[in-house]
Amino acid sequence: MAAARLPSPAPVAHPPALRARPLAPHLYAALPRAPYPAWQEPLPLPEGGDHPVPPKKKIKVAPLLPERADQPVVTSNSATTTRPQLCAPYDDEIEATLRAMETNPAERPSPYFLETTQGGRMTALVRASMIAFMDEFSRFHELADGTLQRAAYFLDRYLSVTPESDDALQLRLVGATAVFLAAKYEDQYTLRKIDASMVAARRGYTSETRHKMVSIMETEMLAALGFNLGGPTAYTFVEHFTRYYGDGEEEELLKEAAHRFADGSLLTYGFHRYLPSIVAASSIFLARLDVLGHEPWSQDLAELTGYKAIDLMGCVCDMEEKSRRAAAQHHLESKPAGAAGVGINSSGDDHTRPIRPAHLYIVSCRCSW
């Protein structure tokens, strides 16, 4: 009698391979901490409008070059030649979408929310301390790049429609929730690093109420934002404008300096009146002046950003003035008593090389860009 054949075992379903965890994000340079010196005063209110409006001109996009194996992509940051598009079928649409979203009133903070919505209950110094706390919070948990910019964007929009008390614990909860919400938007792996209970525990709430308090605040913030979370920030535009940069040391220094200038502008109440693309372009202008020491703008950059150097005059001068005051204050605090004075550039480093003010480059520019 033939032996009975055993049934074949069912195939084992293997779980799908996990995606590689992203590399540790770049840690931004630390922003100043409270108490803040006199240079942290808000920007003066602009005349004749809520915020600078970019020139009404058609954004020039570099045409697609013929596909040739010997046609290199131009990566020099000082080149004036036409650059090929990285994603030709969608480059125009991406550019148009970003520009439309940044000018959408529904996704912009109120120009004077401290004076109107907050009614004087919150000062520019209190807001600056919230931004500094949010920066420390995001760096402590090593959250994704761009989290601080988006969190500040959420905070300003939230404060534009929601009156807040001056309770320090409540303001910390608002700031921490903005960071938590922004981090989840920027990186899908955020919950591997931090959750609502961890957010509330660091804010001083007890174990019985901490998760509930963060969830309630997150719901309130989402409602205040109208569930519109994807508006571009200055970080978005710095990455967009430098997308043609290579991996060279100079290009990396320029991008890092541009992000440092953009992040530094978050501390000062008033920069939110500038469009994010203007803040980003001005940050690149000052970064080139800081790193290269010459030629902060070019026709290539004017075509890429859509702004001439003269269009950036107001934001560049405001940003440079705040950066110089912050650097001077930091230098005075760190200089030993009786030490001889040395030159300070906009990044706070000691140099003997004098730096020409940015507005002189703009005024002396004889070109159309």
Curated annotation (Swiss-Prot):
Alphabetical list of InterPro entries matching this protein: Cyclin, Cyclin-like_dom, Cyclin-like_sf, Cyclin_C-dom, Cyclin_N
Entry's Gene Ontology cellular component terms: cyclin-dependent protein kinase holoenzyme complex; cytoplasm; nucleus
Keyword annotations: Cell cycle, Cell division, Cyclin
GO molecular function, one term: cyclin-dependent protein serine/threonine kinase regulator activity
Record bears the keyword Cell cycle: yes
Region (Disordered): 328-350
Family classification: Belongs to the cyclin family. Cyclin F subfamily.
Keyword presence, Cell cycle: yes
Species: Oryza sativa subsp. japonica
Matches recorded under Gene3D superfamilies: Cyclin-like (1.10.472.10)
Higher taxonomy: Eukaryota, Viridiplantae, Streptophyta, Embryophyta, Tracheophyta
One GO-annotated biological process of the protein: G1/S transition of mitotic cell cycle
UniProt protein name: Putative cyclin-F1-1
